[in-house]
Amino acid sequence: VKVTFKVEKGSDPKKLVLDIKYTRPGDTLAEVELRQHGSEEWEPLTKKGNLWEVKSSKPLTGPFNFRFMSKGGMRNVFDEVIPTAFKIGTTYTPEE
């Protein structure tokens, strides 16, 4: 399963807007959560159209970890995928 995370316009230090590509035939993402660096808590991302987004009242602290569950029941965690100093338009691919 290949997953990529592209940082989209609208992202800023307190908000992350992502185009997440999940390539598994016949399956789609059901839930995506983010854990900030140094945090124990997973925060849910909200799906808006084809994009996923998370907002915070304080600046987000990377590198960011992601956890997902697909509609087909696949679960996975990706550590330190996107750095704090992310660039809009950049696609980040987790290491296998």
From Swiss-Prot:
Domain (Expansin-like CBD) ranges: 14-94
Subcellular location: Secreted
Superkingdom, natural source: Eukaryota
InterPro entries according to UniProt: Allergen_Lolp2 (IPR005453), Expansin_CBD (IPR007117), Expansin_CBD_sf (IPR036749)
Keywords, sorted A to Z: Allergen, Secreted
Major location (coarse): secreted
Protein's UniProt keywords contain Secreted: yes
Pfam families: Expansin_C
Cellular-component GO terms for this entry: extracellular region
Record-linked SUPFAM superfamilies: PHL pollen allergen (SSF49590)
Similarity section: Belongs to the expansin family. Expansin B subfamily.
Identification of the protein by name: Pollen allergen Dac g 3
Annotated source species: Dactylis glomerata (Orchard grass)
